[in-house]
Amino acid sequence: MQSSALFLMSCQNALAQKKGKPAVWPLVPIYDVSVFCDLGLEPPWVLKQVQFLQRCGESCGVPLVVLKSPLYQDFIKNFGERRAISIPWWTLKEDGHKSTMPRNCTIDYKVNVIAKYVRWHLLGYRKYQRLRKADLKGHEMHMGFGAEETRRCKENPNPMFINKFPLVEMGLKRADNYAYIKDVWGLSTRASACTFCPYHRNYFFQFLKENEPEQFAHVVHIDELLRDKTPKPPMDSDLFISRSRKRLVDLCPADCNDAEYFDYHGQQIWNGF
């Protein structure tokens, strides 16, 4: 939803430029390219939103590229067999201590994948070729973090990029971005996050179970891997997808009464998390 708003603001600016008018969103440039990383298991509405964005981008001259970034497939293959990517699973020790795993999936399967695409495909670098001086911190990477996500706004460790967070600078929260997309573009959006993201509320998994049983089965399979296999290197904690630190199949209605909503013209809209 947040990144979708940022992309559509760029499209709106492109349309304004074609008409000889000033940019509607001065902090948002007309992007050379925007990138969506398909992590292998996305909620159905996410792919529909991406298709909508691609159509808008084609009509406005703002390209949107979809890159395959197989987080889901890699995790299924590697967990319990070799070192797997660190996803922020909820942890629980025998003594009751609770914590979370480090979150490396966004960097490894989104930011780094985009950086490689820019370096190899857009800038034409070859393997082992050193960066040209003009490319050292010579490119902006705009991220669709909303104003409620300021803690995620950090410098980019890649020597090519300077991170920018226009939605944060404009003070736009998730509700603002939803309203913008709905009012200007006519699309009702939900949050974009892989189906097995541990930051989902329990309501999300209940929604999948009732409306997208095939997707729910895939997520349950991951939860069973967390239960049945020992991570490498071994840990002294049990790992869970659910923030309640229960198996998804064991969640009860009371556990799932945690959906988050925001107001849109007097309506309560589920944010998709």
Regions found by a protein language model. Give the residues of each.
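Nucleotide-activated chemistry modules centered on ATP-dependent adenylation/adenylyltransferase
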Residues: 1-273
